[in-house]
Amino acid sequence: MKILVVGTGAREHAICSALADEATIYSVMGNRNPGISRLAGNSLLLLKLTPKVVRFASEKGVDMAFIGPEAHLEAGLVDALEEAGIPSVGPTRDAARIETDKSFMRKLFEDYRIPGSITYRVFSDPEELREFMEDFDSEAVVKPVGLTGGKGVKIVGEHLRDNMEALKYATEVIEKRIGGHPSVVIEERVVGEEFTVQAFSDGEHIVPMPAVQDHPHAYEGDQGPITGGMGSYSDSDGLLPFLTQKDYEDAVEIMQRTVDAIRKETGPYRGILYGQFMLSADGPKLIEYNARFGDPEAMNVLPLLESSMLEICEGIVDGNLKSASFMNLATVCKYLVPEGYPESGVAGAEIKVDEKKIEDMGVITYYAAVNQEDDHIYTSSSRALALVAPADDIYSAEELCEEATAHVKGRLYHRRDIGTRELVEKRIKHMEDLRS
């Protein structure tokens, strides 16, 4: 079977790796990712425009497509491929609004009484926004309605001093159309521990994957600006050290009810659904959805997949998804990023990766926003590569992953604290304090 994987990052490298033993991989990339290039052979094309992607897929006789990035979903690539007779693992443009339109997502929860929602309002009038914020007695979270690459959300107490500073930023979101829409979502700030559950969906049923915790802050100790994700970890039981089985099942139930609601609103949601939750004292609260695999979270779960990825993809597009099994291993993923990331990452700097030594350690290399020219690899201004270590427990995986970073040379940095006992135990104590 011929499968086209759209996307250029470490997430797509992981998707290609999961499919490579069962299918012939074709690739559409924005830059020459060395890991994807290796798996796709000569069957790749460097482009982004939807009509050219569809033409390329048709000319190559592709049987199925797997869409990685959200921008292609918002652009309607799945719809265009389906019109050409090519089914896709990825929702239609309308169904993808669960990610691309935050007001749509919150209204869906309201209309269908899906549990796990939080207090919110959507504004497009700066004066109405000002009146609301003057009386809003919770700490505010400001979210552009549209896509911002994971970097548009600002939270009082983290990035903003108080609700008046939140008002200033929210007004800017409206006036400058940050996220592509002249509107903004204001939500109450929920205190707890964030976690992610990803699920395969055939439009009727979802098959959940192990829970993961991402680390979006740029610097150690959860400090600094929000990034696309500096790394993540998962545990051997599919839960997290602070997450109970009931918490996990409640999150999965929220996701299943969401897929049911989307089906009634837009038609079947076929693809990957990513739920970002805040585990509060009252249980899981839905923070946001992504309409595709998380990056880095995809790299925690895909190396553990025991089931056939090809059969899962076929089940998604055919509407008869069955099940998926995962190895009982923990994982730690650490991103190596250019100096200055995320504000002004060093671009064009050469990096050297001793993949053989990393592989011999049992650690996996996934290339991200780098560009290969001949036998040399150069950074862009974004994340360069991810290292993923599977092991029997989180702390063993962390030690292995950290040791492997020594085999990557260049003007890069990473968060050394992800997956460490100190940071994980801090999460556990935080939840214990909240629940008591």
Swiss-Prot record:
Query: How does the cofactor bind to this protein, according to its record?
Result: Binds 2 magnesium or manganese ions per subunit.
Q: Where does Mg(2+) 2 bind?
A: E288, N290
Q: Does the keyword Manganese apply?
A: yes
Under SMART domains, the record lists: GARS_A (SM01209), GARS_C (SM01210)
Query: What is a single Pfam family found in this protein's UniProt entry?
Result: GARS_N
Keyword Metal-binding included in the entry's annotation: yes
Name the catalysed reactions: 5-phospho-beta-D-ribosylamine + glycine + ATP = N(1)-(5-phospho-beta-D-ribosyl)glycinamide + ADP + phosphate + H(+)
* Main EC class the enzyme belongs to: ligase
Q: What InterPro entries does the entry give?
A: ATP-grasp, ATP_grasp_subdomain_1, PreATP-grasp_dom_sf, PRibGlycinamid_synth_ATP-grasp, PRibGlycinamide_synth, PRibGlycinamide_synth_C-dom, PRibGlycinamide_synth_C_sf, PRibGlycinamide_synth_CS
- What's this protein's name? Phosphoribosylamine--glycine ligase
State the organism named in the record. Methanothermobacter thermautotrophicus (strain ATCC 29096 / DSM 1053 / JCM 10044 / NBRC 100330 / Delta H) (Methanobacterium thermoautotrophicum)
State which gene encodes it. Answer: purD
